[in-house]
Regions:
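Short beta-strand-centered segments at strand-helix junctions
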Residues: 13-25
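Short, basic amphipathic alpha-helical segments that act as recognition/interaction helices
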Residues: 35-47
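Juxtadomain coupling helices with adjacent low-complexity linkers
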Residues: 51-63, 93-102, 110, 147-178
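Structured interaction and signal-relay segments at domain junctions
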Residues: 50-52, 58-125
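A short beta-strand signature within small-molecule sensing/ligand-binding domains used
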Residues: 125-137
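Short hydrophobic/glycine-rich mini-motifs in sensory/regulatory modules
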Residues: 40, 136-146
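Short Lys/Arg-rich basic patches
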Residues: 1-14
Length: 178
């Protein structure tokens, strides 16, 4: 699957002010949903299969947060779709970071180690770091990720937290396949 690139286009004219257009470029092969509004305007939206699990992912995140006592974030390939243990408006619908995109592409879980200096910041514009993260894979395709966020003064993650996130990613992936 491709990615969405953000571009700025400037149209210059000698006798008129410059026009600046901001556009999102969707990669070739990405599925789109096409809508029309009441005025007949056409709206293109990148299809997110994990978005269909939004309510389910939100419930799963809440149970996981209560069980582990750590903040949980679920993302599709582009945005945060579910949050538990933190204010939702702080993270919901925010764009995932390039470093999280890279992690998803590796298809391997991540666990922050004690004293680690290069921490994984999973969400753009939010100064929080992942303690454990795992990609969600369905039918051989990466469709998102789930993670515990590190909190101030929390103990380092152990095998139990790593296994919880890995199982959660596997379970959400299986739900996507059905």
């Amino acid at each position: 699957m491709g990615h969405i690139s953000h571009v700025t286009i400037v149209q210059e004219a000698k006798q008129h002010p410059d026009k600046v257009f901001h556009a999102n470029v969707i990669s070739d092969g990405d599925p789109l949903e096409i809508y029309t509004d009441n005025d007949g305007e056409v709206i293109f939206k990148k299809y997110s299969p994990i978005g269909e699990l939004g309510a389910f992912a939100s419930q799963y995140a809440e149970v996981l947060q209560k069980t582990a006592g750590r903040a949980v974030v679920v993302c599709d390939r582009d945005h945060v779709i579910a949050v538990a243990g933190l204010p939702k408006k702080e993270l919901l619908e925010r764009r995932v970071s390039p470093s999280l995109e890279d992690l998803m592409e590796t298809r391997h879980p991540y666990a922050m180690t004690e004293g680690e200096t290069a921490r994984l910041q999973p969400v753009e514009g939010v100064d929080r770091y992942a303690a454990v993260a795992a990609p969600i894979v369905a039918s051989g395709d990466v469709c998102g990720s789930i993670m515990f966020l590190a909190g101030e003064g929390e103990s380092p993650v152990g095998d139990a937290e790593i296994k919880l996130i890995t199982v959660a990613a596997g379970f959400l992936g299986k739900q996507m396949e059905e």
